[in-house]
C-alpha cells in the first residue's frame, strides 16, 4: 500500500478526527486512560470496578472542591463587607464635635514622652523596682511640669486642630495597652505592685533576678514535685532541676506550676462564652435581687463584683441555716457542696441530653437547695417540679418570671447580645458558677478571719519578693508595719481584707480582662483545694467507691496512688504524646479535684483552721499576711542562703 494513500482508504476504523499529515490526533489523557483500561482488562477480577469507583470519586471531589472554593469566596466577600461597615461606623463614632465635652477637657492631650529603659511609660524611673504608693496608684503618677497642660490650653489646642480632628488621631501617640502599667493591691500594709502585661510572670522574674547569693524554697509540696520530676530525664531537662539535697525550686518549674493552676477553671473549648466569675455574678445578682430594692440595680458584672462584700455575708448566713436544717443523705465526707456525677463521667462539659448532666447531679449541693427555696432556680430539667410553685401557678393562672434568666440577660446582653445562655439548659455554666461561688465564700471566710495589722508569726515580707530598696521607696517600708487605711483596718472588730482585695485586686483585674476566671485570680486557692482533695483519697475515676464508703460506719477511704493532678496536667500541656481528648480529660480531672476540695474545705466547721493547717504544713504559710500573698501568687518563697 502506498504511503500517499489518503486516510479514508486505510483499513483502519477511524475514531479520531483526521489530521492534515494523515496522523491520528489523540490527547495525552485519553491515551493514559486507554492504557489503564487495557491493563485493567488484562488483569480482570475486581480491578475494573475499583478504577471506575476511583474515577467517580475524583469527579465528585472536583465538584466538591469547586463548591467549597465558591463558598469560601462568598464568605470572604461578606466578611470584607462587614469589616468595611464596622470601620465606617467606628469612624463616624470617633469624630468629635466642635465643642469638646467636659470629660475631654479634663484629659491632657497626648504627647510623645520619653520612656525610661525597661519601663514603657514616662516618669517610671521615679518609681523604683515596679512599686508605687497607694495614693499615686489611685490618682495616677505625678506628671513632669512640662507634661501638665491646663484645661484652657487643651481647649485652645482642640480648637486649633479644627472640627475635623478625631479621637483616633489625638490618641495615635499613646502607648499600646500592653505597655500601660497596672496596679494591684494585695494587703493594706504594703504598697501597690505595678506590672505591665503578666502580673505573676513579672513578679517571678523580679524575684529571681534580685536573688544573687541566695535561693528560694516554697514548701514541702513543691519539693515533692521536684523530687518526683527529677527521676525523669526529660522533665529534669525541661524544668532545669538540680541539687536534690536542698529545697530550692527553679524558675521554670515555678512558672509551669503557676500556669497549670491558673488554667484550672479556664475551660479549653471554643464554645465556652462565659467565665465562672461571670456565671457566679449572675447567680449572685438573682439571689440578691431584694438588695437592689430602693437603689439602682446592677447592669454589669463589674457592679455585682463590687457588691461582693455585702452579698457574701448574707449568702453565708443562709447557707449555714440550710445546712442546720438539712434533711436527707449527705455526700461522702459530709461534703455539702458535692455533685452526684455518674461513675462514667470523664469530661466536665455534658455532651448529651441537651447539655444536661445526669439526673440528680445537683441534689446534694447546698447552694442549689438554697436557690430553689429563694426562687433563683425554679426548675432544672430532669428534676421533679416543686409542688408549691405548681399549685401557685395553677391558682394565679400565670407563671413566675425566671429570675436567673432575667438577671443573666441584664448583665450579659452587652457582651453576648441575644445569645445569652440559659443556665438550667446549658448546665456547665450553672455548675461553674456554683463552684465559683463556693470559692468566693471560702475566700471571704478565710481572708477576714484575722487582721494583717495583728502581731505576726511568719517571716515573709514583700521585700523578699522585690527587694528591700523597692519596698523602701514604695510608701510603707519593710512591708510589715504601716498605718491603717480608712475603712479597711481592724478597728472595732472589723477585718476587711476581702473588701480590700475586691476593690484593689479583683475589680481592676476584671476591668483589665473581663474573661478572667477565679483560678487566674487566686491560683493559691486552687492549689489548696486540689491538695485537700488528693489528701482525702478521692479519685474522679472511682466515684462509685467514694459514694459507697464515705460517711457510713466510720469507714476510711484509702488513697490508692500517689498521683499529682497538677503534675499530670503540666505533662499533658507540654507533651506531644497526648491527644486533644486525652489532654482535655486530664484537665477535667484536675477541675473535678478542685471542685471536690472546695466542698471539703467549706464543709468543715472552721475552714480557716483547715486552710491554716494545709498552708503551714505544705506551703510555708504561717499567718494571714502570708496567706493573702499565697492565695494571690500561688506560692510563698522562703529565703535560703547558698
From Swiss-Prot:
Recorded coiled-coil stretches: none
SS bonds (residue pairs): none
Keywords: Capsid protein, Host nucleus, Host-virus interaction, Viral genome packaging, Viral penetration into host nucleus, Viral release from host cell, Virion, Virus entry into host cell
One matching Pfam family: Herpes_UL25
Disordered, as annotated region: 97-125
GO biological process: symbiont entry into host cell; viral DNA genome packaging; viral penetration into host nucleus
Region forming the signal peptide: none
Subcellular compartments: Virion; Host nucleus
Record's GO cellular component terms: host cell; host cell nucleus; viral capsid
Annotated region described as Interaction with major capsid protein/MCP, given as residue ranges: 1-48
Protein origin, superkingdom: Viruses
Subunit structure: Heterodimerizes with CVC1. Interacts with major capsid protein/MCP and triplex capsid protein 1/TRX1 at the pentamer vertices. Interacts with the large tegument protein/LTP.
Function: Capsid vertex-specific component that plays a role during viral DNA encapsidation, assuring correct genome cleavage and presumably stabilizing capsids that contain full-length viral genomes. Participates in the interaction between the capsid and the tegument through interaction with the large tegument protein/LTP.
Family from the record: Belongs to the herpesviridae CVC2 protein family.
Protein name (record): Capsid vertex component 2
Annotated organism of origin: Human cytomegalovirus (strain AD169) (HHV-5)
Lineage summary: Viruses, Duplodnaviria, Heunggongvirae, Peploviricota, Herviviricetes
Encoding gene (name): CVC2
Amino acid at each position: 500500500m502506498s504511503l500517499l494513500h489518503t486516510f479514508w482508504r486505510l483499513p483502519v476504523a477511524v475514531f479520531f478526527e483526521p489530521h492534515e499529515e494523515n496522523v491520528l490526533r489523540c490527547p495525552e489523557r485519553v491515551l493514559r486512560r486507554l492504557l489503564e483500561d487495557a491493563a485493567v482488562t488484562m488483569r480482570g477480577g475486581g480491578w475494573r470496578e475499583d478504577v471506575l469507583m476511583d474515577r467517580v470519586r475524583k469527579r465528585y471531589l472536583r465538584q466538591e472542591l469547586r463548591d467549597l472554593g465558591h463558598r469560601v469566596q462568598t464568605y470572604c466577600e461578606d466578611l470584607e463587607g462587614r469589616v468595611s461597615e464596622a470601620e465606617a461606623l467606628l469612624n463616624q463614632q470617633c469624630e468629635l464635635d466642635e465643642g469638646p465635652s467636659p470629660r475631654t477637657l479634663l484629659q491632657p492631650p497626648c504627647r510623645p514622652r520619653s520612656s525610661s529603659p525597661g519601663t514603657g511609660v514616662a516618669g517610671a524611673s521615679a518609681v523604683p523596682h515596679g512599686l508605687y504608693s497607694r495614693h499615686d496608684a489611685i490618682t495616677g503618677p505625678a506628671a513632669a511640669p512640662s507634661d501638665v497642660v491646663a484645661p484652657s490650653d487643651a481647649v485652645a489646642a482642640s480648637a486649633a486642630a479644627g472640627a475635623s480632628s478625631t479621637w483616633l488621631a489625638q490618641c495615635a501617640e499613646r502607648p499600646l495597652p500592653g505597655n500601660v502599667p497596672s496596679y494591684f493591691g494585695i494587703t493594706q500594709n504594703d504598697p501597690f505592685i505595678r506590672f505591665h502585661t503578666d502580673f505573676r510572670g513579672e513578679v517571678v522574674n523580679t524575684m529571681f533576678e534580685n536573688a544573687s547569693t541566695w535561693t528560694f524554697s516554697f514548701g514541702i509540696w513543691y519539693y515533692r514535685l521536684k523530687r518526683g520530676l527529677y527521676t525523669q530525664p526529660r522533665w529534669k531537662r525541661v524544668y532545669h532541676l538540680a541539687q536534690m539535697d536542698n529545697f530550692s525550686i527553679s524558675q521554670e518549674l515555678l512558672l509551669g506550676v503557676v500556669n497549670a493552676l491558673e488554667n484550672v477553671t479556664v475551660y479549653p473549648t471554643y464554645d465556652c462564652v462565659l467565665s465562672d466569675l461571670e456565671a457566679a455574678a449572675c447567680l449572685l445578682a438573682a439571689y440578691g435581687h431584694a438588695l437592689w430594692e430602693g437603689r439602682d440595680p446592677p447592669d454589669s458584672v463589674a457592679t455585682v463584683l463590687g457588691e461582693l462584700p455585702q452579698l457574701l455575708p448574707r449568702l453565708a448566713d443562709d447557707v449555714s441555716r440550710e445546712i442546720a436544717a438539712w434533711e436527707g443523705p449527705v455526700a461522702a465526707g459530709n461534703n455539702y457542696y458535692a455533685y452526684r456525677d455518674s461513675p462514667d463521667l470523664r469530661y466536665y462539659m455534658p455532651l448529651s441530653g441537651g447539655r444536661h448532666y445526669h439526673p440528680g447531679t445537683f441534689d446534694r449541693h447546698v447552694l442549689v437547695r438554697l436557690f430553689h427555696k429563694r426562687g433563683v432556680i425554679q426548675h432544672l430539667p430532669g428534676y421533679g417540679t416543686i409542688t408549691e410553685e405548681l399549685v401557685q401557678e395553677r391558682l394565679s393562672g400565670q407563671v413566675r418570671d425566671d429570675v436567673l434568666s432575667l438577671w443573666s440577660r441584664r448583665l450579659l446582653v452587652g457582651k453576648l447580645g441575644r445569645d445569652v445562655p440559659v443556665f438550667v439548659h446549658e448546665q456547665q455554666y450553672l455548675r461553674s458558677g456554683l463552684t465559683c461561688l463556693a470559692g468566693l465564700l471560702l475566700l471571704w471566710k478565710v481572708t477576714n478571719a484575722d487582721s494583717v495589722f495583728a502581731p505576726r508569726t511568719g517571716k515573709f515580707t514583700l521585700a523578699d519578693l522585690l527587694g528591700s530598696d523597692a519596698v523602701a521607696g514604695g510608701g510603707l517600708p519593710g512591708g510589715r508595719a504601716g498605718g491603717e487605711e480608712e475603712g479597711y483596718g481592724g478597728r472595732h472588730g472589723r477585718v476587711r481584707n476581702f473588701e480590700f482585695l475586691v476593690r484593689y485586686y479583683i475589680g481592676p483585674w476584671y476591668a483589665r480582662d473581663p474573661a478572667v476566671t477565679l483560678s487566674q485570680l487566686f491560683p493559691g486557692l486552687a492549689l489548696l483545694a486540689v491538695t485537700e482533695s488528693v489528701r482525702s483519697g478521692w479519685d474522679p475515676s472511682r466515684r462509685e467507691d467514694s459514694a459507697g464508703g464515705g460517711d457510713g460506719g466510720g469507714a476510711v477511704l484509702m488513697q490508692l496512688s500517689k498521683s499529682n493532678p497538677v503534675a499530670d496536667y503540666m505533662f499533658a500541656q507540654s507533651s506531644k504524646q497526648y491527644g486533644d481528648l486525652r489532654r482535655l480529660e486530664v484537665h477535667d480531672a484536675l477541675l473535678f479535684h478542685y471542685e471536690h476540695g472546695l466542698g471539703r474545705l467549706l464543709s468543715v466547721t472552721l475552714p480557716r483552721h483547715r486552710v491554716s493547717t494545709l498552708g503551714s504544713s505544705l506551703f510555708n504559710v504561717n499567718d494571714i499576711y502570708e496567706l493573702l500573698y499565697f492565695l494571690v501568687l500561688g506560692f510563698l518563697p522562703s529565703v535560703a542562703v547558698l
